[in-house]
Design a protein with these regions (language model features):
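Compositionally biased Ser/Thr/Gly- and acidic/asparagine-rich
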Residues: 1-179
Length: 179
């Protein structure tokens, strides 16, 4: 008798989105977002993962209680997928054209994903198109770029601002960092 591991009606327990940064056809970096019940917008040990290279081309940050660590994996409560803004860190040299695209989009219908560039005042609807930029100056740190997950279709005409300041102190340092 053969067995089948498929269980009818077994609910999906998490959703995933992977963003990738490319220069031309070359993939440079990716960052992952997971949404699962029981997680928070802060650090969830065993789920959130800091990037081994804090100067990597593409990182995200915690939405709550950010302590200045760039993440390769950012895991959040499943309900957050309906309305959350996540700081994104892009580290690129001036004059180097790059694009950010959605690679994996394992998220239920109706969720819209936008990349905000608050310096240029743009909202790129990543469900429909890639974000492309040739920076005039080197990019680094947080505060300019954000990923928006929402159930609404946003317009670049809307006055959306995510001017955030992050302040944190690492345990082994004698100073506070403000970004």
């Amino acid at each position: 008798e053969g067995g089948d591991d498929f269980i009818a009606g077994n609910p999906v327990t998490y959703f995933e989105l992977v963003l990738k940064l490319y220069e031309g056809a070359t993939e440079i970096e990716d960052t992952k977002f997971y949404f699962k019940n029981g997680l928070s917008l802060g650090l969830d040990p065993g789920y959130d993962a800091g990037h081994y290279n804090q100067s990597a081309a593409l990182l995200s940050r915690l939405v709550a209680e950010d302590q200045g660590v760039g993440l390769a994996v950012n895991a959040m409560e499943i309900e957050s997928i309906n309305d959350v803004v996540i700081p994104l860190e892009i580290n690129r040299e001036a004059g180097e054209t790059f694009r950010i695209t959605v690679d994996t989009f394992d998220i239920f219908g109706g969720v819209q994903v936008y990349l905000e560039d608050n310096q240029n005042g743009t909202m790129t609807h990543l469900n429909l198109e890639d974000f492309v930029l040739t920076p005039e100056i080197a990019l680094g740190g947080v505060g300019r770029f954000f990923i928006h997950f929402t159930q609404s279709v946003l317009s670049t005409q809307e006055n959306m601002s995510t001017s955030h300041l992050n302040a944190y102190k690492l345990n082994n340092q004698n100073f506070i960092t403000i970004e």
